[in-house]
Amino acid sequence: GIPVEALRKIGAAISTAPADFNVNPKIVRQLKAKAAMFETGEGIDWATGEALGFGSLLLEKHRVRLSGEDCQRGTFSQRHAVLIDQVNQNTYAPLNNIDPAQGVFEVYNSLLSEFGVLGFEYGYSLADPNALVLWEGQFGDFANGAQVIIDQFIASGETKWLRMSGLVLLLPPGYEGPGPEPSSAPL
């Protein structure tokens, strides 16, 4: 498992912002709620568990790369991996501030071109197989535009070219998403 001290270090990083950073009051409440989760050890939600997982990899000096239409905030306003200063629009990524010797955390809000973005991330995962590369589909049937990449590269690339990809697809709606084909990226 992950050492308790590492979890505390990650928890401190993801529940605070620099003193001179003007955080939106709603986000301040969320950061305080995260801090309370770490104090009590109770109520750890999905987004916090995700951040702990990413943070543990970063402390092991791995690169973590996440892209998708609304990844910085999170499709359901749950992640807040990048905070935005309400006065000057500067950004702050808590997961890049755990330890000076950590790996790099990259999180990109992409354009709504699933075919292009997922194709790029697939290529990135092949170029850097030691990185955790994730693509998050937006809520709704937005993985359908990427289905060719899923079928022709991700699902069959190892068989075709003997190249494995560790690309992770995060598909928030699962089978309950709205639309005519709510299965969101069947393999």
Question: Where in the sequence are the language-model features?
Answer:
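Flexible, glycine-rich loop/tail regions that form catalytic "lids" or insertion modules at the edges
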Residues: G1-L187
